[in-house]
């Protein structure tokens, strides 16, 4: 048994001295005698001293306490026993529902699947949210980022996606709450419980009030549980299709920044850790699909000060298949979900994947919206009357499209009083195609606001004129 003693404690950082010929490896977990605290080795400083980060509060620790090297990285329970349970970063239950019965324990630091093991798919994942399905469709087994500043609706959009996809999806889901509000974690738990899909969801939380070590590692804990479901073959010899929700990737980066500063590394641009790209890559490269099973991940990404060029969101962009950008200016118009249709993108936007009709409709919608955007300055200075008849028509259609992008959410029913709407992709394409074709030029634009499919628009317009 390899034992050392604590020689220094600075906040969440603990230095431990071991015999020089028996120094623990980086990422090894150390247990401190008489406590439940786990330390993770981050650096080897020489002379047998290792610098570690504490996963938990360091209150009550003192020098000369004995720390034992476990000989491996942090392990967490995996398997069906984790479903319906809320766990912390170490896989300990925090829902007061008794111990977790697990089939196996896996280390949270793992290699990404090799290049030949990876598989790609072109199958679309329908979300029932019009603006997403039309402008930035998701791929099954792909990675999606929800980008947005403070208070534009990332978590509400995430909850609606969980509501629409996880409930319809017969597979399993893992939710990793990384540095977010405890209230949101609680809301999510009750949302799943009320909709009877709790037994298909594993929840891992490292919330805002926890030390940086917990927030940094909780995303890896959730990912490890998802990887087990993907890789573990069932009776048919196949793994499962798993949904992985991470809220919020920015807090993962921020926890890394805190740890990096505590470890004494020189900060890089905007104060971020110099290892930002590598840390992001280590997490994102593991979120992938293999021939065995798939992981479809939906990640919320906070954008500091609404600046998409900030190093944290900018580093995340390169790893994603679809990006959904939420805009404060669209939220200010009262259009929810506040997705910016011209700033959101998807690698699936190819006529060979989504079909000619969908592709052409999307292109025409984008052209109409772009034309309206270009004309906004002229309208602001000279007014609508100075526009040509063609331009007036384009502006009218663009405003209808903008309003038709809004829709009532199931998860927002309690606030709005309007029942949520799930719109199938074929109805979405049909509706927007009809608008750009000019079939509804005679209807008032208010009729397009906060409805589901195009039939509801006609019904609403009839009520308004009645």
From Swiss-Prot:
**Keywords assigned:** ATP synthesis, ATP-binding, Cell inner membrane, Cell membrane, CF(1), Hydrogen ion transport, Ion transport, Membrane, Nucleotide-binding, Translocase, Transport
Q: Which PROSITE patterns match?
A: ATPASE_ALPHA_BETA
List localization entries: Cell inner membrane
Q: Name the source's superkingdom.
A: Bacteria
Q: Where is ATP annotated to bind?
A: 148-155
Q: Which SUPFAM superfamilies would you find in this protein's record?
A: C-terminal domain of alpha and beta subunits of F1 ATP synthase, N-terminal domain of alpha and beta subunits of F1 ATP synthase, P-loop containing nucleoside triphosphate hydrolases
What's a single GO CC term here?
Answer: plasma membrane
Q: What is its main location?
A: membrane
Which catalysed reactions does the entry list for this protein? ATP + H2O + 4 H(+)(in) = ADP + phosphate + 5 H(+)(out)
Would the keyword S-adenosyl-L-methionine be found if you checked this record's keyword annotation?
no
Q: Which family does it belong to?
A: Belongs to the ATPase alpha/beta chains family.
Q: What role does it play?
A: Produces ATP from ADP in the presence of a proton gradient across the membrane. The catalytic sites are hosted primarily by the beta subunits.
Q: How does it assemble?
A: F-type ATPases have 2 components, CF(1) - the catalytic core - and CF(0) - the membrane proton channel. CF(1) has five subunits: alpha(3), beta(3), gamma(1), delta(1), epsilon(1). CF(0) has three main subunits: a(1), b(2) and c(9-12). The alpha and beta chains form an alternating ring which encloses part of the gamma chain. CF(1) is attached to CF(0) by a central stalk formed by the gamma and epsilon chains, while a peripheral stalk is formed by the delta and b chains.
Q: What is this protein called?
A: ATP synthase subunit beta
Q: Which organism is it from?
A: Xylella fastidiosa (strain Temecula1 / ATCC 700964)
């Amino acid at each position: 048994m390899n034992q050392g003693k604590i020689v220094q404690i600075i906040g969440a950082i603990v230095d431990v001295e071991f015999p020089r010929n028996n120094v623990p490896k980086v990422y090894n977990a150390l247990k401190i005698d008489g406590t439940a605290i786990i330390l993770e080795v981050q650096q080897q400083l020489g002379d047998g001293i290792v610098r570690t980060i504490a996963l938990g509060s360091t209150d009550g620790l003192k020098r000369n306490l004995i720390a034992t090297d476990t000989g491996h990285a942090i392990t967490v329970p995996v398997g069906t026993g984790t479903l319906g349970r809320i766990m912390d970063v170490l896989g300990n239950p925090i829902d007061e529902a008794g111990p977790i019965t697990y089939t196996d324990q896996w280390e949270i630091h793992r290699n990404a699947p090799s290049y030949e093991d990876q598989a790609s798919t072109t199958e679309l994942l329908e979300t029932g949210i019009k603006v997403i399905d039309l402008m930035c469709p998701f791929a099954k087994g792909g990675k999606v980022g929800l980008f947005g500043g403070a208070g534009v609706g990332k978590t509400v959009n995430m909850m609606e996606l969980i509501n629409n996809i996880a409930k319809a999806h017969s597979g399993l889901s893992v939710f990793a709450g990384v540095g977010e509000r405890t209230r949101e974690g609680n809301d999510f738990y009750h949302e799943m419980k009320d909709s009877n899909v709790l037994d298909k969801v594993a929840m891992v939380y490292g919330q805002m009030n926890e030390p940086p070590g917990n927030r940094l590692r909780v995303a890896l804990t959730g990912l490890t549980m998802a990887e087990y479901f993907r890789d573990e073959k069932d009776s048919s010899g196949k793994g499962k299709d798993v949904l992985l929700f991470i809220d919020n990737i920015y807090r993962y980066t921020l926890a890394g920044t805190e740890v990096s500063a505590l470890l004494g590394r020189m900060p890089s641009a905007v104060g971020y850790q110099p290892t930002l790209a590598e840390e992001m890559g280590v997490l994102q490269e593991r979120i992938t699909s293999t021939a065995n099973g798939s992981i479809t991940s939906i990640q919320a990404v906070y954008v500091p000060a609404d600046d998409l060029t900030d190093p944290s969101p900018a580093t995340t962009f390169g790893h994603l298949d679809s990006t959904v950008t939420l805009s404060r200016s669209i939220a200010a118009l009262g259009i929810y979900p506040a997705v910016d249709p011209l700033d959101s993108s998807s690698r699936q936007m190819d006529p060979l994947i989504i079909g000619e009709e969908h592709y052409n409709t999307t292109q025409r919608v984008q052209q109409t919206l772009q034309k309206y955007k270009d004309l906004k300055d002229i309208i602001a200075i000279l007014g609508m009357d100075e526009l040509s008849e063609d331009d007036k028509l384009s502006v009218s259609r663009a405003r209808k499209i903008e309003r038709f992008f809004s829709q009532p959410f199931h998860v927002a029913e309690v606030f709005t009083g309007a029942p949520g709407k799930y719109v199938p992709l074929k109805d979405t394409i049909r509706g927007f195609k009809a608008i750009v074709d000019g079939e509804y030029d005679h209807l008032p634009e208010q009729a397009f606001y906060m409805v589901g499919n195009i039939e509801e628009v006609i019904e609403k317009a009839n009520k308004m004129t009645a």
